[in-house]
Amino acid sequence: MNFWQTTQFPYSWNHRGVTVPWSGSDHEISYRNNIERDLWQNIDISYTYNAHGFRTDELTKHLGQPVDLALGCSLTEGIGVPLKDAWPSIVAEQRSVPMLNLGIQSASTDTVARILTNCIGLFDIQHVFILWPDMARFELYNKDRIESVIPT
């Protein structure tokens, strides 16, 4: 599979079409071990992923329409915060077109470039907002999936 084609829905290694209570580095063990967990007791965080694995509207809803794109890693996806508090949601409040949050936890600069390439021709892209991931990260391409590599 060519993961770098234009007019192709971007690949995500996230859950697809579900709502889950934990995701990625936000998991129950880290919550239990957090000495400040009491500060989070009244904050509802869940992760609703669309059919393509992104924490945003269904992509098919916006085909051919004007949109802004937000790209990046877990900070863009909003891991550990309610979706309304993720930076793409805050920027979207000041914009006149829908913002598609295409951030993926563990993303690399490869991921950002690949997803942007995929979106060309799918949407009428107005602006692209990027919070660049660490430059040491990269993607490995397999026949039917992509792996994110984060060197230690």
Short names for language-model regions:
Residues 1-69, 122-126, 131-152:
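N-terminal secretory targeting modules
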Residues 50-110, 115-120:
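Serine-esterase "nucleophile elbow" of acetyl-processing enzymes
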